[in-house]
Curated annotation (Swiss-Prot):
Homotrimer. Belongs to the transferase hexapeptide repeat family. NCBIfam families: dapD, PRK11830.1. The gene is dapD. It comes from Legionella pneumophila (strain Lens). The lineage of its organism: Bacteria, Pseudomonadati, Pseudomonadota, Gammaproteobacteria, Legionellales. Disulfide bonds: none annotated. It is found in: Cytoplasm. GO terms for molecular function: 2,3,4,5-tetrahydropyridine-2,6-dicarboxylate N-succinyltransferase activity; nucleotidyltransferase activity. Pathway: Amino-acid biosynthesis; L-lysine biosynthesis via DAP pathway; LL-2,6-diaminopimelate from (S)-tetrahydrodipicolinate (succinylase route): step 1/3. This is 2,3,4,5-tetrahydropyridine-2,6-dicarboxylate N-succinyltransferase.
Length: 276
């Protein structure tokens, strides 16, 4: 545990006794250092280590401490003003800084400080919350939301109105993770720390939480909380044992390898559920 992490951990344990007036300058500086590190990609709330996702809870604790200790302030967005504890990421960015970032930000896209946006990303009018990590080549389409501490991989397309859930509270919850080369269909919601593994396609209007049944029609298996790599997923229903009703589920209709995913259009993959 480094000194920065130790300071954050200790402060979080004593958070009930902390206020802006009682917090030390060292603590305020430490929180700002974490937010800056999240903002520029130096820190990530979650990262893949030896093939497994590891969550750095202390970074989430620093974000929560910022909400407790930082005062609200005026945020001037030009066309109107806001009043919040966390400033916007691009408020003071110059033309040169935007060019260096390689990010395209369409009017009315909102990104909070502490979110990392990698190059070749396009932000349509959308919302990206603090602690989120968006890797290279991502499209965040109109009215899509990327929640606090969500992790978005390379070349992901998040379609219009889709929601990727945030997880600052409860603190023990893991962030929602979308791995590389995934397509998230319009108006879908993926929340509660669900992991969508690489090269997967989530159809329009699919809802995935930790309690959502994920039915694999190829194997007949039911799982929770994770979409396997290369899956094509649509919304469906599973009947009850007595046949009196059915309940919502997500259905894996097909699994494809990386070569097939690269060659075949999204629409062709989604038509797989019309085969029978």
């Amino acid at each position: 545990m480094n000194s920065l992490q130790a300071l954050i951990e200790q402060a979080f344990e004593n958070r009930q006794n902390l206020s802006l007036n009682t917090a030390s300058s060292d603590l305020i500086n430490a929180i700002n250092e974490v937010l800056s590190g999240l903002d520029n990609g130096q820190f990530r709330v979650a990262e893949k280590i030896n093939g497994e996702w590891t969550v750095h809870q202390w970074l989430k604790k620093a974000v929560l401490l910022s909400f407790k200790l930082f005062p609200n302030q005026i945020i001037d967005a030009g066309f109107c003003k806001f009043y919040d504890k966390i400033p916007l990421k691009y408020t003071d960015s110059s033309n040169e800084q935007f060019q260096q970032s390689g990010v395209r930000v369409v009017p009315h896209a909102m990104v909070r400080r502490g979110a990392y946006i990698a190059k070749n990303t396009v932000l349509m009018p959308s919302y990206v919350n603090i602690g989120a990590y968006i890797d290279e080549g991502v499209m965040v389409d109109t009215w899509a939301t990327v929640g606090s501490c969500a992790q978005i991989g390379k070349n992901v397309h998040i379609s219009g109105g889709a929601g990727i859930g945030g997880v600052l509270e409860p603190l023990q919850a893991n962030p929602t993770i979308i791995e590389d080369n995934c397509f998230i269909g319009a108006r879908s919601e993926i929340v509660e720390g669900v992991i969508v593994e690489k090269n997967s396609v989530i159809s329009m209007g699919v809802f995935l939480g930790q309690s959502t049944k994920i039915y694999n029609r190829i194997t007949g298996e039911v799982s929770y909380g994770r979409i396997p790599a290369g899956s094509v997923v649509v919304a469906g229903n599973l009947p009850s044992h007595d046949g009196s009703h059915s309940l919502y589920c997500a259905v894996i209709v097909k699994q494809v390898d990386e070569k097939t995913r690269a060659k075949v259009s999204i629409n062709d993959l989604l038509r797989a559920n019309q085969d029978d």
